């Protein structure tokens, strides 16, 4: 089918996520045709370096025949198996075991979902069940962080703190609370790490006391705030927050949907600070985006409370496609690839990526470069001293994304003029160098725009 026919069919029928429906109708879809390694090809034959791994998820890179073969073998042998009725499949059982073996601390129990949003949703249900089983049903208040992202399901989007996910949906709910982001570049206390940690601890204490310590169920945090603009907290921040939650007896949920599976270097970002959460959510890199799957990791003590609380009764939470054998078979092969060289390559490529992006720091539009491993951001400003963001009237996200695309690069351009990077771990030196060169070209072209020049005057 010709690309223009697909464009019309898309315009008429396919609803795209987090998009202006009328805006998309006017623009039309860009049809992707194929991909290999870190390169994608569109329907016109244009090749682009995927600097964002799809949607932070194709960590292993595109076109691994061994992943395709693992899926095909499982489809031929057992394409579906429910995990209801005490049934199971070998891939799902082995995957749960392999993940538990590699998870921080005593996160020895794994519940499989279809992705990140329903993984977060599942934790909310499990947290509520936990506190009811402990005889503390009043603990029904949840805290997360401004500019955080915890999915786009009804309750998860309420924990998310991005306006686009709230407008028109009647969320967040009254039981969902926020504290300020540790955002070093734009923090009221400045960029000193110790001051930021102290401010966050103070804010969390105030919020807990305001709600009532006996009423707070759980606190949610990403090791790096992804969709909020790749905000990297100072070293020690997450560990300090986790310890405060422990002091108050509040469950701590680490959302590693983006950071998990080598994105920041190790398999899980929590291990960089020896953090053992009560729950950990993952998805994206779990299957490298080849098939849908997410996972909730649950600590022993949480599992025991839930299991003992239910006794002979069923814990009434489940999905038709939980522990899907094909997804599990894919995840097992992806995990093998990570440990057979991709994690190491990602660490090397991440160092090259950060060095390359830091080389752009002298560009007139670059206010800050930040990141860890293969997860990074460049924040654009019109005044470096005042940290003035690009004017909203310039539509920086749309403009920069389109321009990068024309230059053969896919990145995430956030509305506030932040460029997000999350390339596949398989990137070669030439892939990384192309990302940097095409970013610089995109910045130079944007600097030449009359309205941007005027804003900088």
Give the ranges of each region predicted by the language model.
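Conserved N-terminal phosphate-binding loop of PLP-dependent enzymes in the Aspartate aminotransferase
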Residues: 1-457
